[in-house]
Amino acid sequence: MVDEATKRTLAAIPLLKTRAGPRDKDQWVGRLKEELVSLIKYVENNKKQDNDWFRLESNKEGTRWFGKCWYVHNLLKYEFDVEFDIPVTYPGTAPEIALPELDGKTAKMYRGGKICLTDHFKPLWARNVPKFGIAHAMALGLGPWLAVEIPDLVEKGIIVHKEKTSSE
């Protein structure tokens, strides 16, 4: 079901061990450290493969994440704000990743710009609790979603590259 490139990407992302969410106070600090190690490794791997496609930061508590993600289509870079909150039931519940500026532009999205991950990603997440974390959500959730949806939205004229809109 998963292609070889995805398997290689997954194998290079460290798995997490601590089963803790924001309500677990001290254990959450440990889980957050594991999350950061995993995210840093994933970003480093992406940079080595010339596949750098997002930046994330969080609030002090590690419960609200935000940043930028981008997708290159026809040699044009499309950049979007990305945000998500860590659910109180995390890691049992995956984060709901949102791209607010795309809200309402595709059927594969919920209100508020939350991308639809129910069919493919959520069952995989459920089988891998607590081993999967934020890096896995980006690699298996947002990355594939961008790869499918952005070219489609561009071809339909729903999103236009920023340089094209400013030069018209």
Curated annotation (Swiss-Prot):
Catalytic center residues: C116
Classification via Pfam families: UFC1
GO process terms (BP): protein ufmylation; response to endoplasmic reticulum stress; reticulophagy
GO molecular function: UFM1 conjugating enzyme activity; UFM1 transferase activity
Keywords, sorted A to Z: Ubl conjugation pathway
InterPro entries, per the entry: UBQ-conjugating_enzyme/RWD (IPR016135), Ufc1 (IPR014806)
Physiological role: E2-like enzyme which forms an intermediate with UFM1 via a thioester linkage.
Family, as annotated: Belongs to the ubiquitin-conjugating enzyme family. UFC1 subfamily.
Protein name (database record): Ubiquitin-fold modifier-conjugating enzyme 1
Record organism: Trichoplax adhaerens (Trichoplax reptans)
